[in-house]
């Protein structure tokens, strides 16, 4: 109760509703009816704290005031990056960035008259910069938070932060780009985001949010969805990239395959130098060998401009300022010269494109062939290619009679295109619809693949992996191009087959999380985050006593054993 008004509630706690959206509405009604300035929602697993600013908006706060504190002390408190780590709503309250964005949409964005994707992207961009600066200067205070300013003062501060971020990471937003949210709407969004830590070891925090934003726009129309990070990690473990590998993702989405390849190689570099392993997606400064690898060896391409900007952001930050993510149509390479001559395109992408051109074979300059060691991709598999100018560039564009077809599945052309990106002995991991592996009509495709490379493995993914976007059954194909030294041609050889047994998501597309069998509570990783339950590779979680508990080896570990037994070149 309010100490100055003993009969008036000071804090109301809502315990009943299992979903935050339902419970928050109930909480609002109670607070509005009683005038209580603080509301708390919890379902026993998650908890959220709110300050009732007016009947229509409840501002998230970090906690309820202690007996010696006022509400204003909580609202106006200054925070360092270390303070943020302690109150992070994602690890402490088990919230997701996606759910917080949905909350912002309900509160203000739906009626703000702005492009939600662009405005949230700007805020995430500015907040990532703020976290980077404050992690590297432990005495600095975070600016991305409402510390008692007026709404207009707050907007001026956040716009300045965004402008500084644009200078640090060029080519994502134009110099003229401004935050378009009104001061009052921006204040709501800042309050919602200020107590979460975006820098996260596995990128899930940011990735999940961008997938949600883009799935509402054009992504689903072409059958292209961000690949879950646990599928990416399995592919990286099985393809085992090394510091000398040239790596590309030809349909990069948010660039998970390349970023996680970077993390894996960085671990190898640090282990070889006797340095602490470090984390993946952090603001920590990188040693020269790490940034040189990103600058010279890692590339990504996508046809969607928004997707490319997301991918470039994550690559720039993960790579400490380095990125070779390019906005191009991978399949339509005959038009690359025309596109790359455009001034605006050149300003952003020219440095990366010059490096890509150097990876063509000697004497080749039409972008049809490259010399990469590793291609990993999840190409769009909905919609056919119908342009004759594209189809005529591919052998798989012909039918069984050797004549060009009027339309060809997009993923089919990606198979051939990806193989043409590889040098002899190069390897590929590609996500494909299950039908390509067993449809009688696709026999010619399978024969084409077998003629050009050794089929290393096929891993069947669970039907729920790409839900809620699609329930299409998919598998990952792993191959290595024939080469006299790295992969001598054989007529008969063993192939590794495996099928994912744990679905990782339920039928609605919600992630299924690992449970600690000793406590019956959700298992957490060393960052206090929930762990998706799957069997693609070996999982571990932190026990109550602070020790790490390793679970059974998964598919990736079984393949590594197979690869060593077979003497595959990239596991020697």
Segments the model singles out, each with a brief description of its role:
Residues 92-112, 188-191:
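Short amphipathic alpha-helical segments and their helix-coil junctions
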Residues 1-38, 46-84:
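A short, conserved, highly charged catalytic patch centered on acidic carboxylates
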Residues 8-10, 34-38, 44-45, 294-296, ...:
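Short glycine-/polar-rich loops that comprise or flank the Walker A/P-loop
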Residues 114, 179, 199, 203, ...:
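Conserved phosphate/pyrophosphate-binding and hydrolysis machinery centered on Walker-type P-loop NTPases
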Residues 120-121, 125-216:
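Long recognition/docking surfaces used for binding and targeting
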């Amino acid at each position: 109760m309010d100490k100055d008004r003993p009969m008036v509630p000071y804090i109301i706690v809502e315990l009943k509703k299992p979903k935050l959206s339902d419970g928050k509405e109930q909480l609002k009604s109670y607070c509005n009816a009683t005038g209580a300035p603080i509301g708390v929602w919890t379902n026993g697993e998650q908890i959220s704290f709110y300050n009732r600013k007016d009947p229509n908006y409840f501002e998230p706060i970090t906690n309820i005031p202690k007996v010696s504190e006022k509400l204003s002390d909580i609202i106006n408190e200054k925070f360092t990056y270390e303070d943020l780590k302690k109150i992070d709503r994602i690890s402490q309250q088990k919230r997701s960035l996606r759910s917080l964005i949905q909350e912002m949409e309900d509160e203000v964005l739906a009626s703000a008259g702005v492009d939600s994707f662009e405005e949230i992207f700007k805020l995430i961009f500015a907040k990532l910069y703020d976290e980077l600066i404050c992690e590297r200067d432990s005495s600095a205070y975070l600016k991305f938070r409402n510390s008692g300013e007026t709404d207009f003062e707050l907007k001026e501060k956040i716009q300045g932060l965004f402008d500084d971020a644009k200078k640090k990471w060029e080519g994502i937003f134009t110099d003229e780009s401004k935050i378009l949210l009104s001061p009052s709407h921006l204040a709501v969004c800042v309050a919602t985001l200020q107590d979460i830590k975006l820098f996260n070891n596995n990128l899930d925090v940011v990735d999940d949010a961008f997938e949600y934003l883009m799935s509402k726009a054009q992504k689903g129309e072409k059958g292209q969805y961000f690949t879950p990070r646990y599928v990416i990690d399995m592919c990286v473990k099985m393809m085992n990239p090394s510091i000398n590998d040239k790596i590309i993702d030809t349909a990069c989405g948010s660039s998970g395959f390349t970023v996680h390849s970077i993390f894996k190689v960085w671990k190898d570099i640090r282990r070889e130098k006797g340095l602490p392993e470090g984390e993946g997606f952090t603001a920590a400064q990188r040693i020269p060998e790490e940034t040189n690898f990103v600058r010279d060896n890692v590339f990504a391409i996508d046809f969607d401009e928004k997707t490319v900007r997301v991918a470039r952001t994550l690559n720039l930050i993960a790579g400490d300022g380095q990125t070779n993510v390019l906005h191009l149509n991978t399949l339509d390479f005959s038009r690359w010269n025309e596109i790359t001559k455009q001034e605006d395109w050149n300003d952003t992408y020219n440095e990366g494109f010059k490096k890509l051109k150097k990876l063509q074979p000697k004497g080749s300059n039409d972008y049809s062939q490259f010399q990469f060691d590793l291609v990993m991709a999840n190409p769009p598999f909905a919609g056919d290619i119908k342009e004759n100018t594209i189809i005529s560039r591919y052998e798989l564009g012909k039918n069984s009679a050797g004549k060009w077809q009027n339309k060809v599945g997009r993923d089919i052309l990606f198979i051939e295109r990806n193989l043409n990106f590889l040098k002899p002995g190069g390897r590929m991991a590609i996500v494909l619809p299950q039908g390509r592996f067993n449809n009688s009509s696709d026999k010619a495709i399978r024969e084409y693949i077998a003629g050009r490379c050794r089929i290393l493995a096929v891993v069947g993914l669970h039907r729920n992996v790409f839900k809620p976007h699609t329930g299409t059954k998919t598998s990952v194909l792993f191959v290595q191009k024939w080469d006299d030294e790295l992969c001598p041609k054989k007529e008969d050889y063993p192939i590794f087959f495996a099928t994912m047994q744990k679905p990782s998501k339920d039928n609605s597309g919600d992630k299924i999380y690992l449970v600690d069998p000793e406590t019956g509570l959700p298992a957490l990783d060393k960052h206090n985050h929930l762990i998706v339950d799957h069997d693609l590779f070996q999982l571990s979680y932190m026990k109550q006593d602070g020790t790490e508990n390793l679970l059974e080896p998964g598919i990736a570990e079984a393949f590594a054993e197979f690869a060593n037994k077979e003497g595959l070149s990239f596991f020697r």
